[in-house]
Amino acid sequence: MSQTTTETIIPLDSSVKDKLDPEYVNFYNKYVCSNLPIVKTHTYPVDFLRNNGNVMPGQSELLPVESTEDITIPRKHTKAPSGVPSRIFRPHGTAPEGGWPCFLWFHGGGWVLGNINTENSFATHMCEQAKCVVVNVDYRLAPEDPFPACIDDGWEALLYCYENADTLGINPNKIAVGGSSAGGNIAAVLSHKVAASPANFPPLVLQLLVVPVCDNTANAKTHKSWELFENTPQLPAAKMMWYRRHYLPNEKDWSNPEASPFFYPDSSFKNVCPALICAAGCDVLSSEAIAYNEKLTKAGVESTIKIYEGCPHPVMAMDAVLEKGRILNKDATNALLAAFA
């Protein structure tokens, strides 16, 4: 039976403590371990987790942008009873000739948690630092809407950007996709889908995959990080499996390329856009990120992987307290600027 009471935060597991960045360890011990209740995601009901928010501190403040607009993207290409809520951030300044570059972003949360507000800090930083319109997609979540609902929502959002570039004030030749964790999974899938689309859309200029889920069949036998970081903080293996089973209740879907982009055929990899993959060194997902980068590179795709050693899964969302979180932010900015040039 799922627990509904909070527990005392436990110390960092001995199997991983010495591998973690000292800056993270100090922050965890000072501000997390002693002051906050633990929320063991895989032992709590989904509604409890959604209503109690993200207890992990460390995210930087939002950057001021020129404007923020919430819209609902009408559903045109897939089947569902409603459109796709999204938030549009526009940067300060004068748009370049042809329109602003566009960055389509998908938040993390294991396809179960998170929402349009979860990663606004990162979205506003990319908007201002990379001078692009950011479309933050509030895709449907499992278990209410399991696979492939979020993929359909992401596809609607991407095609909306292509088909309504003039209205949005963006350049359809300068569109990038990205996401963190489960959102990185969605972005990777969309990179394959648009490359294979018969609609002849301009190619994406970048896929920015931050601590992405690339292989939903992964386990300790197939991916070393699942063994090494079974008890890593914030995304232990049991927690990842909790997410997977909510999103993919039918195990036969685990190897579907739209759930595990690692399993797209080699012919599909040859056509996808360049990539920057940001992996956390102490993340259960790090091995599959490395394997995905190798597959992209083998296919001739310009792909770079950066590994933030000693960092746990949420390094991107800890840029206010971790130097390596700030470095990741800068790496992402530079990759977008180069792709949009």
Curated annotation (Swiss-Prot):
GO terms of molecular function: hydrolase activity
EC number of this enzyme: 3.-.-.-
Subcellular location: Cytoplasm; Nucleus
Main location group: cytoplasm
Keywords from the named record: Cytoplasm, Hydrolase, Nucleus
Gene3D superfamilies in the record: alpha/beta hydrolase (3.40.50.1820)
EC class (word): hydrolase
The keyword Kinase is annotated on this UniProt entry: no
Family named by the database record: Belongs to the AB hydrolase superfamily.
Cited PANTHER family: AB HYDROLASE SUPERFAMILY PROTEIN C4A8.06C, ALPHA_BETA HYDROLASE FOLD-3 DOMAIN-CONTAINING PROTEIN-RELATED
Protein name as it appears in the record: AB hydrolase superfamily protein C1039.03
Organism annotation: Schizosaccharomyces pombe (strain 972 / ATCC 24843) (Fission yeast)
